[in-house]
Amino acid sequence: MLRSGYAPSGDQPEAIRRLVEGLNDGELHQTLLGVTGSGKTFTIANVIAQVQRPTLILAHNKTLAAQLYGEMKEFFPENSVEYFVSYYDYYQPEAYVPASDTYIEKDSSLNEHIEQMRLSATKALIERHDTVIVATVSSIYGLGEPASYFEMVLHLVRGDMIDQRTLVRRLAELQYTRNEAELRRGSYRVRGDVIDIYPAESEKEALRVELFDDEIERLSLFDPLTGEVISRIARYTVYPKTHYVTPREKLLEAVEEIKVELKDRLEHLRSQHKLVEAQRLEQRTLFDVEIILEVGYCSGIENYSRFLSGRAPGEPPPTLFDYLPDDALIVIDESHVTVPQIGAMYRGDRSRKETLVEYGFRLPSALDNRPLKFEEFEARAPQRIYVSATPGPYERAHSGAVVEQVVRPTGLVDPEVEVRPASTQVDDLLSEIRFRVQGGERVLVTTLTKRMAEDLTEYLMEHDVAVRYLHSDVDTVERVEIIRDLRLGKFDVLVGINLLREGLDIPEVSLVAILDADKEGFLRSAVSLIQTIGRAARNLHGKAILYADKVTQSMQQAIDETERRRAKQIAYNERHGLTPRGITKSVTDILEVSIPGGSAGSRKQAARVAEPGAGYKVAKPSEAARLIKQLEEKMYAHARDLEFEEAARLRDEIQRIRESALMA
């Protein structure tokens, strides 16, 4: 059920109708060409609501995914809206550098909160049809075999017969750990015939199983922090702690297959007189096998995933796509970036692993622990809609028809584009900036090199212009703060090299200046120019100036496309008597990244209890993970001592740090 205070307008109704019609007609590829500010997300939400199908939305980075997740939560408050991104705060893959004989061990920091959300996403696909999952390209990486995962679930029904020892053994098979001191996600505790389980995919609720004479007498959901019972239930399904669970008999079969491959590989290495590599491989593999037999898993178990899932050599790994129902829909947002990203993942992963195999760090089967190849993604992905203001060649070649959404509901038209000589670009820019600043408007300037951006910033400062320089070293949170300051008028001009990234749609920006627009290359391609020109599309007086001594083919394409859209928008406004109106979003509204785990659309206070928060400033995600772990230990300690106010304060502080870290 779609909830919104707006009705589709402008090009939206026709775009929705055509996309829904295409889906119902079985079209595999469709493209929505939607200009900046035309309400592409709202259109997609309406399509999802009309076709009533499980949907996977792919974004090209975590920040964009978090924004889409927040918007979808607002549009579908009663649906199961989930978030599936990489659960690593920090990840250093295993690698070997032969030139210096350096082995780099795998090092990572897992974000438990995101891991919980990933498990929640696959659970939703199994249990509900009204699921919308927002994911990044990490969804093409290997995940546990769905058949094994489903086989391992534990169904608990009130009145069923099960003894305490059997229940505890089943939880251990699901990789839950026993913890009598504190109940944490993915753990359980036993107190006589009462067993408390904190499901790995649950955000806030734990399960209490009360047995009487080997019968499940009562099932209850309760708050793991306070112990308060929330509700009594008749049945509950406990899902494995991780996607990488395997039944014992399959595990034993896999171990035998690993030993067979090891024997063959050792013979091969010794025949080539690679004795050091052979010894290394034998030692490492037999150690892993021993650990697997003892506890059911080992560090780096994903390298043996081919055997655990029973696949043939070279066969693609199971991924999130294997969990999708047959009638699912895929929406690829910012497809001009996301589609090439999908294709690039496999190649980088392959070259690193081939070195590990060659030098005896891994068995050849480790090569099958990989992301999907692009052709495998194509074969697995169901019907899909590509969404972009500038669709790439792949989308255009595969889509039967491109559905255009050029007219904005606000009546705003694309900015006027002007070409001026590059020889006088700096002085001309200075006079344009002064004119815009007098009107209380802001300016974006994009240069080709870091050196030029720094020099220009220095020059503008010398001429009393309030200017800031946005460079690649600025992290996501700081970047958001810089944009906030620009919107608030703390400075008037933002200089950068690549200002295409999402989040730079700022209504106060009335001028975009592109220096050296005639220098062909990635930053001055037709797609890049159209995207950059679009940054001024949310202002009534929007204008783009391209400084160039000649008009290149890319420039001409960008100018022609902008003029085509502008003409269509003006004609629509005249036909319907529509007066363009500027966007008046508050600074908080447009900058807010709705973080998964919080309530959509509302910025949580850092602390909701009487005590002021400590105001921890987190520089890196890896630091955030360590700090969250420390604070969680303190929180549980306070809860055990019945100091619930202090525990609640720490819980809110953890939530604030988690929000900051997720934006990184």
From Swiss-Prot:
GO terms for molecular function: ATP binding; ATP hydrolysis activity; DNA binding; excinuclease ABC activity. Keywords: ATP-binding, Cytoplasm, DNA damage, DNA excision, DNA repair, Excision nuclease, Nucleotide-binding, SOS response. ATP binds at residues 34-41. CDD domains: DEXHc_UvrB, SF2_C_UvrB. Residues 21-410 form the Helicase ATP-binding domain. Residues 425-578 form the Helicase C-terminal domain. The UvrABC repair system catalyzes the recognition and processing of DNA lesions. A damage recognition complex composed of 2 UvrA and 2 UvrB subunits scans DNA for abnormalities. Upon binding of the UvrA(2)B(2) complex to a putative damaged site, the DNA wraps around one UvrB monomer. DNA wrap is dependent on ATP binding by UvrB and probably causes local melting of the DNA helix, facilitating insertion of UvrB beta-hairpin between the DNA strands. Then UvrB probes one DNA strand for the presence of a lesion. It comes from the Bacteria. The keyword Nucleotide-binding applies. SUPFAM superfamilies: C-terminal UvrC-binding domain of UvrB, P-loop containing nucleoside triphosphate hydrolases. One of its GO terms (cellular component) is cytoplasm. Forms a heterotetramer with UvrA during the search for lesions. Interacts with UvrC in an incision complex. A motif (Beta-hairpin) lies at residues 87-110. Belongs to the UvrB family. One of its GO terms (biological process) is SOS response. It is found in: Cytoplasm. Residues 625-660 form the UVR domain. HAMAP family: UvrB. The beta-hairpin motif is involved in DNA binding. This is UvrABC system protein B.
